[in-house]
Amino acid sequence: MGEAMGAADIRRVLSLLPHRYPMLLVDRVVSMVKDQSIHAVKAVTMNEPFFQGHFPGRPIMPGVLIVEALAQAGGVLAIESLGLAGSGKLVYFMGIDGVKFRKPVEPGHLLDLHVTILQAKRNICKFEGRAMLGGQLATECQFTAMIADPPGD
């Protein structure tokens, strides 16, 4: 069994991900099991800049940003599981498969991000992600990412 790694507040998330406003889409980690899974959350507010144009009068979080939130949660899981915190390594998308959007995500929602590692080989991980709203599936996908040095290193 994997080692329980516990919760992480926004300060820890900021130390693990290079993303900053407006692209940081993980607010905190509820729980994490090394080499296995993470449960993180994103509080979706009307202050998100994308709601200005998506859509006026009917704000809905863009699906690609829900997938990005899942990928960021997966990045936290990968960096922590591999003991790479503080290394400067980045997690890059390589592919996304089987994305399904089932419920719209709106201002005021708390988006629960559940990501599981399906496979890890060297510096490449395959994940399964589920974004939930109040226990109901909003978005699901599988994605592959590579852990590597930043460009220019």
From Swiss-Prot:
Cystine residue pairs: none
Residues at the catalytic site: 54
Enzyme class: lyase
GO cellular component terms, semicolon-separated: cytoplasm; membrane
GO terms (BP aspect): fatty acid biosynthetic process; lipid A biosynthetic process
Any one GO molecular function term: (3R)-hydroxyacyl-[acyl-carrier-protein] dehydratase activity
Keyword annotations from UniProtKB, A to Z: Cytoplasm, Lipid A biosynthesis, Lipid biosynthesis, Lipid metabolism, Lyase
Subcellular location as annotated: Cytoplasm
Cytoplasm in keyword set: yes
Catalytic reactions of this protein: a (3R)-hydroxyacyl-[ACP] = a (2E)-enoyl-[ACP] + H2O
Pfam hit, one: FabA
EC number(s) recorded for this UniProt protein: 4.2.1.59
Major location (coarse): cytoplasm
Similarity comment: Belongs to the thioester dehydratase family. FabZ subfamily.
NCBIfam families found in the cross-reference section: fabZ, PRK00006.1
Function according to Swiss-Prot or TrEMBL: Involved in unsaturated fatty acids biosynthesis. Catalyzes the dehydration of short chain beta-hydroxyacyl-ACPs and long chain saturated and unsaturated beta-hydroxyacyl-ACPs.
PANTHER family with a match to the protein in the record: 3-HYDROXYACYL-[ACYL-CARRIER-PROTEIN] DEHYDRATASE
Entry protein name: 3-hydroxyacyl-[acyl-carrier-protein] dehydratase FabZ
Species: Sphingopyxis alaskensis (strain DSM 13593 / LMG 18877 / RB2256) (Sphingomonas alaskensis)
Lineage: Bacteria, Pseudomonadati, Pseudomonadota, Alphaproteobacteria, Sphingomonadales
